Every structure is written in structure tokens, then in C-alpha cells.
């Protein structure tokens, strides 16, 4: 688990058109746009990865919360739906689907929210500093 002051880096390389490849440690994945907007539809859109990051982080945080309390999760699915407002989401709704009884799930939600890096980042927006890399001549 990361601590304050640690950092994490991924690199996106533009592949032409509306396609990019993201390198995250030893993993890489395609990012693209649908054909109707000029993409080649060879991978999810950036906003889908964004929502997927939130949903998966929250799912893992719920699993952590359950394990910490000795609760076995029979199954778990978290969906994220973002409502567009211009070039951003104005609201994102997370829905937790599990056969775990509600009285066992409810106490897991607050601890999961406390440790989910993605939802915490969205709740407390970081500064975004865009700069050009140094060019070596």
C-alpha cells in the first residue's frame, strides 16, 4: 500500500489518430475512441478506463474491508456510471452488487471509502501540473 510521498507513474504514447498505448509498469493497454468519432475502436475510451479505475479500486477496497473483518465475500461487482456534463462527469454513481446480506455489507462501505485511492482522489481533487519535458539537444 502506498504511503504519503510515494508516487506512481504511467506513460501514454500516442499511436496516431485517437489511439494511445499506456505503459503501467510491466503492463500495457490500448486506449481508443469509437469509430463514429474517428477512432479505430481497438480499446476502451479514456473515460471508460477512468470509471473502471474507480469501480475496481472500490471493489478491491471492499474486499480488503471484508477480509479485515473476517467476512467472506461470496461475490462482488461494482459498477460505475458517469453522467457527462460537457468535457467532464458531473456525477458518478457506484453500485455494489453482491449476495452478501445488506447488514453485513453496510459496515464495509465506510472503511472501503476511506482506503479507496481513486474515490479519495476524486473527492479531494489534486492539483494537475502540466509541463513540457526537457528536450536534450
Task: State what each model feature region is.
Residues 1-52, 60-137:
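Extended beta-strand/beta-hairpin segments
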Amino acid at each position: 500500500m502506498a504511503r504519503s510521498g510515494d508516487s506512481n507513474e504511467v506513460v501514454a504514447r500516442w499511436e496516431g489518430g485517437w489511439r494511445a498505448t499506456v505503459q503501467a509498469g510491466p503492463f500495457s493497454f490500448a486506449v481508443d475512441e469509437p469509430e463514429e468519432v474517428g477512432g479505430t475502436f481497438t480499446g476502451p475510451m479514456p473515460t471508460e478506463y477512468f470509471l473502471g479505475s474507480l469501480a475496481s479500486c472500490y471493489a478491491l477496497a471492499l474486499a480488503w474491508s471484508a477480509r479485515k473483518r473476517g467476512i467472506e465475500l461470496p461475490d462482488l461487482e461494482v459498477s460505475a456510471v458517469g453522467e457527462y456534463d460537457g468535457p467532464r462527469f458531473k456525477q458518478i454513481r457506484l453500485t455494489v452488487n453482491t449476495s452478501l446480506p445488506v447488514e453485513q455489507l453496510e459496515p464495509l462501505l465506510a472503511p472501503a471509502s476511506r482506503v479507496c485511492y481513486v474515490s479519495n482522489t476524486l473527492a479531494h481533487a489534486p492539483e494537475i501540473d502540466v509541463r513540457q519535458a526537457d528536450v536534450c539537444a
